[in-house]
């Protein structure tokens, strides 16, 4: 449905479109995508799009305007780079000029399912599939809400505009994602990747909410039949979406949550799942969610049958699907729950030295939250691929707008107050490092999580790891005991000891950044021994 180009607020943004399409229905979006030749439908009717050169976020192209209202709060550094007001103004003028007389799609909605702390938002895009992405991922307003919705924060996405003066501006590339927190505006140029809008709003929520004493978290969440909720923290690819989507528990959300005085709540209205090697046997709920109204990104498909090949990474390893949360059958109404009983940190340990599951004290949980360890396998296709440790504070450093200790303090206070249990789960390798070790079996990890959530794991006898200082169970119902003690799973015990010591050193080295000045966050004694 086309609406007047005078849609409230557009002129104030400096936008002069030829046509405006506002909060389209899924059927309308589908027709626009086809008419604009933006995508192809798969054999089961799911829209498939290609996001162009960028198949992932561009973290080095993310900036915040250095302005008085926010400059003393922002965690400046490699994650949040300063840009001047003058450069923002210049690029803002270029972006609005670029969108002049174009057909625009406008999504108005919300972020945050808690009425007290949600923000109303507007996303302006030039492509129908980006409008589709927003409709899937943000909270869709009712007709009544839409009629009176006054956006507090706006994203203007001119993905087709590239900044030709980036060198003169001292920026990283012709791509930019710039936030002006005083004006409550974000402008995007040069990248079509949908995740920039999703994580852009998350970065904004990570600024405003903690300042109101509400913890924002890069985690998934679900709730059991008795109202017992659990949080799953982890970096991309560690299993947040997969492990929180559980047929026996209701899904609250798969990636972004808040925790306030009433409990936990989802920030989003949809899920954004990785689809590489998606298997209907091990991930039936996600597989079933991929249907009409879902949106597949950068997948490879058969040109004739349009059947998707989920095993192919020909375009990217980061193949994705976004879908509205109601595509999952077993969801928590309202996407919120009471205070969590359990916090689980997920790590993909490519060194294969961490236990399959470890119980953490609150102090150990603080250490591991600030460390945010996972490991990825770097390198080219030729030659040896060695694991590379990645330390991403709060298991989501790229989206943290305030200093990591700000979130850690809130997490520690809430965990103590509500007596929350914490566990560290290795979804990575067992029996050796990359090249030798095998990926932790998904059914085994699910069984470990079931035993944590039903409380049975507490009955186990625990052993303290001599290097990592965490406690791991000697047995877990339904799980092969040899994977529980990581050293036992290695053929060469000396190799294990050396690899564990190497990783411990990296933990210690990384944590030094929290040891300067105040000792408030010195949890180093609860971390690995190097």
UniProtKB/Swiss-Prot annotation:
The protein's name: Phosphoenolpyruvate carboxykinase (ATP)
Disulfides per UniProt: none
InterPro entries named among the record's database cross-references: PEP_carboxykinase_ATP, PEP_carboxykinase_C, PEP_carboxykinase_N, PEPCK_ATP_CS
Cofactor: Mn(2+)
EC number(s) recorded for this UniProt protein: 4.1.1.49
Reactions mediated catalytically: oxaloacetate + ATP = phosphoenolpyruvate + ADP + CO2
Binding positions (Mn(2+)): 199, 218, 255
Entries under HAMAP family matching the protein: PEPCK_ATP (MF_00453)
PANTHER family tied to this protein: PHOSPHOENOLPYRUVATE CARBOXYKINASE (ATP), PHOSPHOENOLPYRUVATE CARBOXYKINASE ATP
Record's GO cellular component terms: cytosol
Species: Leptospira biflexa serovar Patoc (strain Patoc 1 / ATCC 23582 / Paris)
Keywords: ATP-binding, Cytoplasm, Decarboxylase, Gluconeogenesis, Lyase, Manganese, Metal-binding, Nucleotide-binding
Family: Belongs to the phosphoenolpyruvate carboxykinase (ATP) family.
Stretches assigned to coiled coil: none
Compartment(s) of residence: Cytoplasm
Binding-site list for ATP: 199, 218, 234-242, 283, 320, 445
NCBIfam families listed in its UniProt record: pckA (TIGR00224), PRK09344.1-1 (NF006819), PRK09344.1-2 (NF006820), PRK09344.1-3 (NF006821)
Free-text cofactor note: Binds 1 Mn(2+) ion per subunit.
Binding site for substrate: 57, 193, 199, 320
Any one Gene Ontology BP term: gluconeogenesis
Pathway stated in the Swiss-Prot or TrEMBL entry: Carbohydrate biosynthesis; gluconeogenesis
Role this protein plays: Involved in the gluconeogenesis. Catalyzes the conversion of oxaloacetate (OAA) to phosphoenolpyruvate (PEP) through direct phosphoryl transfer between the nucleoside triphosphate and OAA.
């Amino acid at each position: 449905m086309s609406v007047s180009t005078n849609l409230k607020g557009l002129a104030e943004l400096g936008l002069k479109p030829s046509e405006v399409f506002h909060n389209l229905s899924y059927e309308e979006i589908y027709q626009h995508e086809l008419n604009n030749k933006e995508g192809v439908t798969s054999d089961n009717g799911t829209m498939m799009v290609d996001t162009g050169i960028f198949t992932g976020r561009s973290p080095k192209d993310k900036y915040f305007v250095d302005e008085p209202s926010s400059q003393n709060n922002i965690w400046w550094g490699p994650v949040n780079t300063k840009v001047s007001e003058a450069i923002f103004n210049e690029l803002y003028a270029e972006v609005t000029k670029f969108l002049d007389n174009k057909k625009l799609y406008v999504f108005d909605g919300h972020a945050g399912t808690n009425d007290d702390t949600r923000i109303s938002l507007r996303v302006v895009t030039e492509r129908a599939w980006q409008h589709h992405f927003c409709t899937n991922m943000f909270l869709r307003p009712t007709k009544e809400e839409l009629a009176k919705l006054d956006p507090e924060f706006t994203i203007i996405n001119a993905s087709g505009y590239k900044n030709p003066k980036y060198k003169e501006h001292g920026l990283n590339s012709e791509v930019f994602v710039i936030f002006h927190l005083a004006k409550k505006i974000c402008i995007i140029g040069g990248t079509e990747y949908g995740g920039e809008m999703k994580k852009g709003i998350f970065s904004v929520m990570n600024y405003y909410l903690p300042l109101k004493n509400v913890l924002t978290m890069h985690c998934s969440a679900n709730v059991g039949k008795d109202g017992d909720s659990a949080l799953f923290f982890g970096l991309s690819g560690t299993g947040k979406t997969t492990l929180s989507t559980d047929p026996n528990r209701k899904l609250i959300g798969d990636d972004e949550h808040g925790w306030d005085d009433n409990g936990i709540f989802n920030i989003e209205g949809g899920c954004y799942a990785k689809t590489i090697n998606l298997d209907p046997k091990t991930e039936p709920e996600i597989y079933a969610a991929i249907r009409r109204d879902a949106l597949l990104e950068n997948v490879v498909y058969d040109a004739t049958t349009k059947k998707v090949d989920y095993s192919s990474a020909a375009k990217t390893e980061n193949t994705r699907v976004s879908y509205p949360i109601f595509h999952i059958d077993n969801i928590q109404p309202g996407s919120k729950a009471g205070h969590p009983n359990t916090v689980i940190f997920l790590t993909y340990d490519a060194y294969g030295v961490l236990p399959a599951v470890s119980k953490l004290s609150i102090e150990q949980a603080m250490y591991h939250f600030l460390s945010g360890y996972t490991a990825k396998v770097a390198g080219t296709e030729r030659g040896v691929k060695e694991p590379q440790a990645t330390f991403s504070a709060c298991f989501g450093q790229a989206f943290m707008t305030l200093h990591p200790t700000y979130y850690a303090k809130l997490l520690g206070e809430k965990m103590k107050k509500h007596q929350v249990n914490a566990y560290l789960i290795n979804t990575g390798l067992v029996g050796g490092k990359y090249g030798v070790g095998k990926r932790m079996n998904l059914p085994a990890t699910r069984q470990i999580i079931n035993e944590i959530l039903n409380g049975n794991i507490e009955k186990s006898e625990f052993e303290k790891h001599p290097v990592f200082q965490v406690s791991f169970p000697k047995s877990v119902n339904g799980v092969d005991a040899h994977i529980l003690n990581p050293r036992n799973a290695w053929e060469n015990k000396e190799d294990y000891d050396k690899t564990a010591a190497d990783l411990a050193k990296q933990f210690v080295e990384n944590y030094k950044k929290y040891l300067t000045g105040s000792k408030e966050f010195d949890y180093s004694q609860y971390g690995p021994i190097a």
